[in-house]
Amino acid sequence: MPGKPKHLGVPNGRMVLAVSDGELSSTTGPQGQGEGRGSSLSIHSLPSGPSSPFPTEEQPVASWALSFERLLQDPLGLAYFTEFLKKEFSAENVTFWKACERFQQIPASDTQQLAQEARNIYQEFLSSQALSPVNIDRQAWLGEEVLAEPRPDMFRAQQLQIFNLMKFDSYARFVKSPLYRECLLAEAEGRPLREPGSSRLGSPDATRKKPKLKPGKSLPLGVEELGQLPPVEGPGGRPLRKSFRRELGGTANAALRRESQGSLNSSASLDLGFLAFVSSKSESHRKSLGSTEGESESRPGKYCCVYLPDGTASLALARPGLTIRDMLAGICEKRGLSLPDIKVYLVGNEQALVLDQDCTVLADQEVRLENRITFELELTALERVVRISAKPTKRLQEALQPILEKHGLSPLEVVLHRPGEKQPLDLGKLVSSVAAQRLVLDTLPGVKISKARDKSPCRSQGCPPRTQDKATHPPPASPSSLVKVPSSATGKRQTCDIEGLVELLNRVQSSGAHDQRGLLRKEDLVLPEFLQLPAQGPSSEETPPQTKSAAQPIGGSLNSTTDSAL
C-alpha cells in the first residue's frame, strides 16, 4: 500500500546479533548470574541461562554466544566448537571433557565398567605417556594407584580445570572466529549449516564456484579453492599423512599447551589479561596454516607461573628488559599485596630470589610468593631501632629470638610494649597482630644488655641468618669491611707492608737469607758432626750437603717472614 510504511523483512530477534564483544560473554537477567563463573562440571547440571530475547529453537547458532554452557548444551554447537579446537591443536580438551561426561553417567555399582573407562581416560589424557595429554596443574595430578578404586567423580577436579580453560580462553576466540560468523550468516539467510569438518575453518559458502584460470596459468603454491581443503594441511596445501598428523599433534600440542593453556588451579582464578597474550600463540600458528583471520598480534614471550600466598595462581609474562620486581608489581597491586613484604621462591627451592635481576630467568618456571609481616623494634637500652620481618605464622617470641640471642637476653628479662603504653604485650601472639607497628623492647631493672659482636645487616634487622635473606638483602660492601679481619686474629697477623714485601723479594732473588740471628754468610754455615764425612775435614763446608743445608734456612726464613708479614 502506498500509505503503509514499509517493514524491513528482518524477523524479530535478528537485531540482537549485533552485539559487542563484551556482551557475548556477559548476560543479564536474574537467572543468568551464575553463568560466568565457570564452576559447572556436568552438562546435565549446567544452568538453563537467562531468558533469551529470541527463541533458541529457531536460532540455535545465535544462542551459542550467550554463554559457554549454552554452547555445550547444543550438540551441533559442541561439534562446531570441537572443529574449532582442532584447528588450534587443542581438541583433546573438549574430548577429555566429553569423556568425563560419559564417565559420570556410569552407575557406581558397575565397578567393572568404571575401572575400564577410568583406565582408558587416564592412559589417553592424564598419564605421563598419554597420547593426548591435557594441561592440568600439579595439584590435580593423579597417580595410577587411584585406578584401583574408581568412582564416577574421580576426575571431577581435572574436568573443572579443563572446563574453565575452554570457557575463559578458547570460547572467547570461538565466538569471534570466521567459523562462527559463517554459521551466523547462514542462519540469518535461512541456509542449512554444513557438517562440521566438511570445509576449511573460516571458508565461505561451499557453493562458491572455483575461479577460472587462463590456459597455462595455475594458482600459487599453497592456494586452493576455499572450502575444498582437507581439515589438516601441510606446507603447500598438501594433506598430511596420518603418521605426520599424529606426530604434529603430539609435538605441537605439547608446546602450545605449555604456553597457551594455563589452567592453574581448581579455583580458576586466572588473570584474563595475561591469557589475552597467550592466545596470540595459537593465532600466529593458524596464520602459518593459511588462516584468513586478521593481523596477528606481536610475538609473545614466555610465561612464569606465580603461586600467590592465598593459594591461587596467575600467569606473568617474562618480558626481556623487565626485572622480577617490575613483573610482579602488577600482580601484587591487583591482589592487594605489598611487594616489599613479599619473598619470591622457586618452587622446590628455599632460597629467595633477587628481585632486581632480569625476569627472563623465570621463563617457563614456577615461583611462589610468601608474605612477610614487618614491624619496627626500638631497643631503649641501645638507643637503636631495627626492622624485623617474619612469616605470618610466627609468634612474637620467635621473631624476637634472634635479637635476644644476639644481645645475650632471655624472654624473661625483657618487656615488650607499644610506645606510650605500659601494658606489656603477650609474646605468644602472632606477628600479624603488630603488622606495620612500632614496638618498644625494655629490659628489667638490673639486667645489662651486651653489645652484639656480629653487626651484619641481617642480624641487625632481627632475622635469622638464612640464605634467602642474604640473597634478598645483600649487605652493602664498605671499604673498611674489605680488609677487616676478626678481632681474635688481629694480634697475630699484621697488614702486609708493600715496601717490606718488595725488599723480601729482592733478598730472595739475590740468594740472601735471614733468620732471627741476622744475615747468614757462607763462613758461618758449619755442618754438625753427625753430617760430616769421616774422611773429610773442615773443607766439607763446600760439599753439596752444605748447599743443601744452606738452602734450608732460605725456605724456613722465607716462610717465617711471609707469615709475619701476612
Swiss-Prot record:
What segment(s) does the record annotate as region Necessary for interaction with RABGEF1? 299-425
- Pfam families with a match to the protein in the record: GoLoco, RBD, RGS
User: Mind listing the GO biological process terms from this record?
Assistant: cell division; chromosome segregation; G protein-coupled receptor signaling pathway; learning; long-term memory; long-term synaptic potentiation; mitotic cell cycle; negative regulation of ERK1 and ERK2 cascade
Q: Where is this region: Disordered?
A: 19-58, 192-243, 451-490, 530-566
Subcellular location as annotated: Nucleus; Nucleus, PML body; Cytoplasm; Membrane
Positions carrying Phosphoserine: S20, S42, S45, S199, S203, S218, S288
User: Locate the RBD domain: which residues?
Assistant: 302-373, 375-445
Keyword Phosphoprotein attributed: yes
| Keywords annotated in UniProt | Cell cycle, Cell division, Cell membrane, Cell projection, Cytoplasm, Cytoskeleton, GTPase activation, Membrane, Microtubule, Nucleus, Phosphoprotein, Repeat, Signal transduction inhibitor, Synapse
Superkingdom, natural source? Eukaryota
Q: Which residues form the GoLoco domain?
A: 498-521
Alphabetical list of SUPFAM superfamilies matching this protein: Regulator of G-protein signaling, RGS, Ubiquitin-like
Summarize what the UniProt record says about post-translational modification: Phosphorylated by PKC. Phosphorylation is increased in presence of forskolin and may enhance the GDI activity on G(i) alpha subunit GNAI1.
What does the record note on quaternary structure? Interacts with GNAO1, GNAI2 and GNAI3. Interacts with GNAI1. Interacts (via RGS and GoLoco domains) with GNAI1; the interaction occurs in the centrosomes. Interaction with GNAI1 or GNAI3 (via active GTP- or inactive GDP-bound forms) prevents association of RGS14 with centrosomes or nuclear localization. Interacts with RABGEF1; the interactions is GTP-dependent. Interacts with RAP2A; the interactions is GTP-dependent and does not alter its function on G(i) alpha subunits either as GAP or as GDI. Associates with microtubules. Found in a complex with at least BRAF, HRAS, MAP2K1, MAPK3 and RGS14.
Annotated function: Regulates G protein-coupled receptor signaling cascades. Inhibits signal transduction by increasing the GTPase activity of G protein alpha subunits, thereby driving them into their inactive GDP-bound form. Besides, modulates signal transduction via G protein alpha subunits by functioning as a GDP-dissociation inhibitor (GDI). Has GDI activity on G(i) alpha subunits GNAI1 and GNAI3, but not on GNAI2 and G(o)-alpha subunit GNAO1. Has GAP activity on GNAI0, GNAI2 and GNAI3. May act as a scaffold integrating G protein and Ras/Raf MAPkinase signaling pathways.
UniProt protein name: Regulator of G-protein signaling 14
